[in-house]
Amino acid sequence: MKTLIAAYSGVLRGERRAEAARSENKNKGSALSREGSGRWGTGSSILSALQDIFSVTWLNRSKVEKQLQVISVLQWVLSFLVLGVACSVILMYTFCTDCWLIAVLYFTWLAFDWNTPKKGGRRSQWVRNWAVWRYFRDYFPIQLVKTHNLLTTRNYIFGYHPHGIMGLGAFCNFSTEATEVSKKFPGIRPYLATLAGNFRMPVLREYLMSGGICPVNRDTIDYLLSKNGSGNAIIIVVGGAAESLSSMPGKNAVTLKNRKGFVKLALRHGADLVPTYSFGENEVYKQVIFEEGSWGRWVQKKFQKYIGFAPCIFHGRGLFSSDTWGLVPYSKPITTVVGEPITVPKLEHPTQKDIDLYHAMYMEALVKLFDNHKTKFGLPETEVLEVN
């Protein structure tokens, strides 16, 4: 603004000097020299003003981009936490209003469509390609690293580690096209598996299905691996709620030793196992960790047992400032590395020995994947993956 005022003042001074020269009509050479000097000074000031305007515009654009990134992340966090409950309350309320017909129509549709999530849902490439997901990706940023090709003639079960608080890397990489998963693995259809209870929530279920998210239960996985052709990739966050309870910055630990159900499913369908590790997933939120035996951990375990998820006391940054607490995750890089597939035979009735063998192979492959890539993403060579 100061530069613009200076430029405008320069224009006025130049015009006054020129007018004085014409009226006095004395030294023509001197007058022409002064007029030329005024014009060059004015041009220089205007150019400087324009440069300042462009630089301010660029800075403002940068700030707008950052705020759009924050908003895009916050909308997903709020959807994850409250959309289902909020929509349930709103629909129940409409029964008591003149809009009761809307609720009746929706619940009629819900009854008709109840089993759709179990058959892979209704993915929408339009939703998966929304621009909001690119802002979501750039906020952290999030990237997907491919180490090996996947055959479209095979089906796969990806074990995703660690869970983190919300599994933000899993969502961005496999339920949107922000990191171009379909281009990196052409012909492969990713299905991120999450709690079946989410699909009993009105509106939220439609939102989840549009991204290719499905319930993490046996019926759904059996259907996708046996009746949906080949080229399917089921992404299972193996550690689940138990792993989220120990999520904290600086910690690389997975809950895996006693998680063998996904291996049994892979054997029954002959689906290859793919170890997947997300570096930085635990860095984006801080939470209160309750020690084993404490009342807080007791409450969390009861929730986990009867409801399927464990409530966490966590925080990120505020909406307008990174110096305040809020629900927006911290802007920390998340890099998801997809490892080499482990070829699994199809055994209709796998024995415990078979399950233990391929589970051990999977654990070994996951640790190897972690060790091969840890130094590339800021971890020291001495960092060890803790397998619980």
From Swiss-Prot:
Coiled-coil portions: none
Spans traversing the lipid bilayer: 70-88, 93-112
GO BP field: cellular response to oleic acid; cholesterol homeostasis; diacylglycerol biosynthetic process; diacylglycerol metabolic process; fat pad development; fatty acid homeostasis; glycerol metabolic process; intracellular triglyceride homeostasis
Reactions this protein catalyses: an acyl-CoA + a 1,2-diacyl-sn-glycerol = a triacyl-sn-glycerol + CoA; all-trans-retinol + an acyl-CoA = an all-trans-retinyl ester + CoA; 1,2-di-(9Z-octadecenoyl)-sn-glycerol + hexadecanoyl-CoA = 1,2-di-(9Z)-octadecenoyl-3-hexadecanoyl-sn-glycerol + CoA; 1,2-di-(9Z-octadecenoyl)-sn-glycerol + (9Z)-octadecenoyl-CoA = 1,2,3-tri-(9Z-octadecenoyl)-glycerol + CoA
Family membership noted in the UniProt record: Belongs to the diacylglycerol acyltransferase family.
InterPro entries assigned: DAGAT
A GO molecular-function descriptor: retinol O-fatty-acyltransferase activity
GO cellular component: cytosol; endoplasmic reticulum; endoplasmic reticulum membrane; lipid droplet; membrane; perinuclear endoplasmic reticulum membrane; perinuclear region of cytoplasm
Entry protein name: Diacylglycerol O-acyltransferase 2
Factors inducing expression: In white adipose tissue, it is regulated by leptin. By insulin. Up-regulated in diabetic mice. Down-regulated upon fasting and replenished upon refeeding in adipose tissue and liver. Down-regulation in obese animals can reduce hepatic lipogenesis and hepatic steatosis as well as attenuate hyperlipidemia, thereby leading to an improvement in metabolic syndrome.
This protein's pathway: Glycerolipid metabolism; triacylglycerol biosynthesis
Free-text tissue specificity from the UniProt record: Predominantly expressed in liver. Also expressed in testis.
Subcellular location: Endoplasmic reticulum membrane; Lipid droplet; Cytoplasm, Perinuclear region
Consequences of knocking out this gene: Mice are lipopenic and die soon after birth, apparently from profound reductions in substrates for energy metabolism and from impaired permeability barrier function in the skin.
Function, as annotated: Essential acyltransferase that catalyzes the terminal and only committed step in triacylglycerol synthesis by using diacylglycerol and fatty acyl CoA as substrates. Required for synthesis and storage of intracellular triglycerides. Probably plays a central role in cytosolic lipid accumulation. In liver, is primarily responsible for incorporating endogenously synthesized fatty acids into triglycerides. Also functions as an acyl-CoA retinol acyltransferase (ARAT). Also able to use 1-monoalkylglycerol (1-MAkG) as an acyl acceptor for the synthesis of monoalkyl-monoacylglycerol (MAMAG).
Activity regulation note: Inhibited by niacin.
Lipid bilayer topology: Multi-pass membrane protein
Keywords, in A-Z order: Acyltransferase, Cytoplasm, Endoplasmic reticulum, Glycerol metabolism, Lipid biosynthesis, Lipid droplet, Lipid metabolism, Membrane, Transferase, Transmembrane, Transmembrane helix
Residue intervals on the Cytoplasmic side: 1-69, 113-388
